Each structure stands twice: as structure tokens, then as C-alpha cells.
Amino acid sequence: MKSKSIIAQLLYVLIAFMAVSCVADKSEPCPSGEPTRVSGSIVSLEHHGLRGASADKENSVERLELWVFDEDGHFLERAVADLSGSTFTAKIIPSEVERRIHFIANYELADPSVWVGRSEREMLPSISVADDLETIRMWARISYPSIAPNQNLGQIQLLRNMAKFSLSVTPPAESKLYDASYALYNSWNKGTLAPFDPNTGSFPQGQITEPAGVVFANPTSEAAFKEADGAHFFYGFERDQSNIGTGAGITCLILKARYNLPNADYTYYKLDFVDTNKVRYNITRNHFYKMILKKAKAPGRPTLQEALDGAAANNIFLSAEVQALPAFSDGSGMLTVDHTYMVFVQGEPSGTFQATYIPQGQNNPDYSKLTVSVSTPTGQQAAVTSAQHEGNGKIKLTLAQQENLTKRSDVVIGVQGNPDLKRSVTVLVREKYQYVFFKANTSSAENNQVTTQISAGQGNELLISAKLPDVLNAALLPITFKVYTEHFYPKTGGMILGIEGGKTLYKYVLTTMPQNKELQFRFKSNKVNSAENIAVKMDYFHDQTIHVTN
């Protein structure tokens, strides 16, 4: 058998020198024969209710290569696919016998010729990558009995080679934590393209595969911490944590927050990935590790390093729940909602949001399996008196009457026959938010009114500053800040000129929470007589009026 394998490898090398290329790269090795066009489609494994840069990183396929192996697993050729949306075409040599194809996304094989004739069991495990792109490497392996001209290779479900992490801290009234942010620590600096079991020589999903020579990735600076709102994510490579002690540097999250008071000093908590029985999770590729922190019982460590060096705070200083979900969406199939956090401040009698369920392996939604339930946290009044699915994914909410207190309900969307696949939408009914402070120059507003005197003449400054309350959840973003003025123009960048009701306004769209939740907008007068009443409006907030006098 060994001599046969050596002869086979020599034949592949000989073919590589003699054959013409099967793709645009003329130096590419390939078996003999004329290449044929093949096609296929990439199945999106998950859809996201929260979109943005993270969703692009998770789902983007900017390059797709087909690594073709023979029936014994020896490398034959590499084809680079042409991508068009979720479909692709490529040219490979047809075959009447089995071909194994590894589909590799967002990675370029530098020199395919050096791999000709070598085994897939050697090639795939030996290639490791760092998190050095705006995309994630992905992989799939499919065996085909033969490759015919113009064959459709079918739908390809790609497996990401990284895990995803999120931390959601409940509002300060419940968690006692303010200005909460977090980062991933003690994660490996690289990972393999594909999972591989050396005992069987197979490529099973769920098999943790760590490349040789891994070390911890560079620690995240505090400036790069992300908001702990469940909507900002980190990514890391898989790691077997079943036999490591706490002193070995477990993969963890570090939470930075102020305890009990909004002006308290920051302290730090280490959060371990453990289940309800305090058994540590392995970090597995293409899994989503969702941590929900409900309440802090004490302040954390005074420094980040002390938190890293100390014991995990789960179930000691914190009440936290960890979910390890076997896909970036969680559960089989794709369940999305267009809102995860809704606040009603206008006394509305009802509201709606959209839910969509797409069964695994399908492209069209199935609304018939959606379920809706409503719960109210203990000690709070219900914000939603009823919720029902009106068809086509439209969820109608009947809202409680607005009063001078905050009412809350959690609307849970589920799927019949799939108890692990759920989405929770937090709904609040409350009065409009109040700014912590609202100022025009140095004058502070009272009862949503403020007067400021500005010298007559052009080019004199009006500074509008405001601070958002801690209870304002980042999930409500984007929020639009509007300033209605005829006598001033903005000096702050990013403001958009508009006309509304015949009045000039300048809009600023808030997409991220500002530092310390403080806003500042600088204006200058464009008329000698700049006295006027300026209306300032922001979603969810009481309108403010600035009385400018000269």
C-alpha cells in the first residue's frame, strides 16, 4: 500500500508538469482533461436581527476556492470561483470517478503546485490562519460520485473557523452596573481552516482542532472594549478547555463597569464560560456564546490584571447565564426579529414588529410555525397586555396605559417543534426620557425651556450640550437629534440640512452611544439679529426650547 501511494503521488506530480491549467492561473496544477464549468450556491447559515459591521464580518464571502481531491484524498487542483451574490461558478476537470471538494472561503492558497499529490489529511490540518481580515475564513467538504460538464454542485453550507461572543448586561436598575463594556481575553491567536480528527482521518463538525504553536492573541486595549448590550460582538478561535486549570489562562470575558453608582470608580470582573453545573465550555468554531448578566452583588477587582489573575466572578459576585449555541444564529433554522428592544413613550395603544423564520436548508420563510408568548418580570407592571401573530410575521402588541412609571414585558418569539430557537423582544411603556442635563451655552434648561443671551452679529457661537440618561438602552439606536433654526448654522460635522413643515432643521443621526453619553453641537449665528426660539427634538425625549436673546 505504501509503495502504491508513492507511485500515485509521483503520477500526480508528473501530471502537474504536463497538463495545462484548469483555471485562469496558467501555472495551476490539475489533472489531464479539458476543464468544465461547474456552479453552485452558498447557503447563508444565519440571518441577524441586528445588522452592521459584525454581520458583514460573519457572512461575507469575498473569495471562494475549490480544492479538488481524488477518491483517495490526494490533491489534484485548485479552482478560484467567480462569485455573484450567493451563487458561484468555477472551472474544474470533469471526472467519472469520485471527487472530494473542499470549499474554502476568504483564503488564498499561495502555491497549489507544492501540494499536488498530497493527502487532504495532511494538507487541511497543517494550514492555520490568524484573525487578520475583515472577514472570517469558512470551509465545507463534499464528496461527489463524479463531476460532469456543467454540473450544479448544489448548496454549500460553510462552517466558520471562529466562535462568536456577546455580553448583555441588564439595565442598572436591575444589574447595579453602569457604563458596562467588555472584551474577550485569553483567546488563541490562530486557528485551522477545517476541523479534523487525527484518530479517524475525518473532518467532523464539532471536532476541536487547535493548530501547532498557538499562543494567546494580543490583549484587547481598554479603548477597544465594546458596549455590553448584546449587540456588539467579539470573535475568537476554538480551544479545548476540558483539561486546563484556572492558572493556565482560561478563555474569558472581562467586564468593566461602575458598581451601584453612575459616578463610582470602574472595577473589573472575569467571566468564565460555564454551564449551570459550573462545567466549563469548550470554545468551538461556528458556535455563539451568549452571556447575560442580570445582577452584580459586589464591585469587581480594582484593575484589569487583578481580574484576569483572580477567580471568575460567575456565581460569586455576579448572577450570569451562559448559552453555548451551535451556530452564529442559535438553533436550527433562522429566526429573526427586526427589533430586540422597543420603547413606547407617546401613549400608543398598540405597536408592531416583524418576525421571520426560515427553516434549515430553505430560502423561503415559514410563518406558520411562529409562536408568541408574553411574560412580565417579577415586581414590574406589564407593558404588553396581549401579543398575537397577524400573519406574514407581523406581531401586533396591545400596550398597557402609559403612567408615570416604567412598565415592561418580554415578548418571546418561538418556533413550533424547535424549543431551542427563540428570540426575546423587550418592550417598555413609559413617559418620555429626560436629559440628565440640557444646556444652551452655560444656561441649563428647566421644565424643558432654556434662555441664553448671545451678542448680536454674525459668527457668534451657540453650544448645545446634553447628557443622555443611563437607562437609555443602546438597542434603541439609531436616534435622530433635530435642531430647528433659521438664524444659526452648524459647526459640528455630520449634521444634515433639511426642511420639515416649512422650517429649516439640522439633523444628526446617533448610531453609537457617545463617551459618557454626552452630546455637544456647536452652531454659529448667520444673521446680525439672531434672536429666535429654537426647537430641539430627539426620538423618545421631551422636546426642548432654546430662547435666544440678543
Swiss-Prot record:
GO terms for biological process: cell-cell adhesion. One of its GO terms (molecular function) is host cell extracellular matrix binding. Keywords: Cell outer membrane, Fimbrium, Lipoprotein, Membrane, Palmitate, Signal, Virulence. Residues 1-21 form the signal peptide. A lipid is attached at C22 (S-diacylglycerol cysteine). Coiled coil: none annotated. One of its GO terms (cellular component) is pilus. A lipid is attached at C22 (N-palmitoyl cysteine). Disruption phenotype: Triple mutants lacking FimC, FimD and FimE show strongly decreased interaction with host CXCR4 and impaired down-regulation of the TLR2-mediated innate immune response, resulting in strongly reduced survival of the bacteria. Disulfide bonds: none annotated. The keyword Repeat does not apply. Residues 22-51 form a propeptide. Its main location: other. It is found in: Fimbrium; Cell outer membrane. Fimbriae are composed of a major, structural subunit and the minor components FimC, FimD and FimE. Identified in a complex composed of FimC, FimD and FimE (in vitro). Does not directly interact with host proteins, but only as a complex with FimC and FimD. The name (major fimbrium subunit) does not indicate the abundance of the protein, but is derived from the greater length of the major fimbriae. In strain ATCC 33277 and strain ATCC BAA-1703 / FDC 381, major fimbriae are 300 - 1600 nM in length and about 5 nm in diameter. In contrast, minor fimbriae are only about 80 - 120 nm long. This length difference is observed only in a small number of strains, including strain ATCC 33277 and strain ATCC BAA-1703 / FDC 381, and is due to a loss of function mutation in FimB, a protein that restricts fimbrial length in other strains. Probably a component of the fimbrium tip; required for incorporation of FimC and FimD into fimbriae. These long, filamentous pili are attached to the cell surface; they mediate biofilm formation, adhesion onto host cells and onto other bacteria that are part of the oral microbiome. They play an important role in invasion of periodontal tissues and are major virulence factors. FimC, FimD and FimE contribute to interaction with host CXCR4 and thereby down-regulate the TLR2-mediated host immune response. Belongs to the FimE family. This is Major fimbrium tip subunit FimE.
